[in-house]
Amino acid sequence: MILKNRRVYADCSYQYYSGAIDLSDVCTFDGNYERTIYCVEGSCIVDNLRLNAGDSLEVKNHVFSIYGDAYVFIAQVPSTDNDHYFKYTKAGDHYKVTKPWGYELWINGEHPKYAFKEIVITEGNQCSLQYHNFKEETIYLYEGLATWVYKDDDSINNDDVISDDLAHLPFKSGDFKHVKPKVLHRVKAQTDIKMLEVSTPYLNDVIRVQDDQHRPDGKIESEHK
């Protein structure tokens, strides 16, 4: 049985999808993947372990079943070895990165193959106008209302962009964006927003073309203390 109301957001070097778990059915997953399951609503049972909203589970090379009444987001990559793990993280225990515009929760820590983050931006704030040289990412807006800012003329170099070169689109709950390397983008929060992002693991690959706090490119060590 597959997840009900399944939505697929990405099928590239990683897979990213969501769906509902129904009390009347059991969903069984094969064991040939490295997966992260993030419960965002309700609660469910995974092999006798209860996941409540905000809890996550990392599973590798393990066949498992889920049942309950919940909505989950799942990120996965094919497994390339025979190692096993089954790692539970309770809500409130995920690695947190404080940002000037809000914060990030690293749902699967610093996994070497893919990243899964919850990103919160508070009303009236915005992330950097940025691009990535290698990182590919898929951003789902779970809660709130935002504006998606992007460069609509590819003939202009990212580092030479001015405000007149940028376009703006509504970005609302339930929308998602797939961002490939070199694509200039920014999210501006019209309300408090919560996004769920899955990406390739180049977490320090951030080129900030404009930043309200004038932060440099790459990882900001002070945000990780």
Language model features: what each stretch is:
Residues V46, I74, S128-L129, W148-Y150, ...:
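Short hydrophobic/aromatic-rich beta-strand segments that constitute the beta-sheet cores
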Residues M1-T28, G92-E136, A167:
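A short glycine-rich, His/Asp/Glu-containing loop-to-beta-strand
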Residues M1-I2, Y33-R35, D47, A53-E58, ...:
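Cytosolic regulatory regions built on CNB/CRP/Popeye-like sensor folds
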Residues Y67-K99, D154-D164, L184-R186, Q190-K225:
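Double-stranded beta-helix
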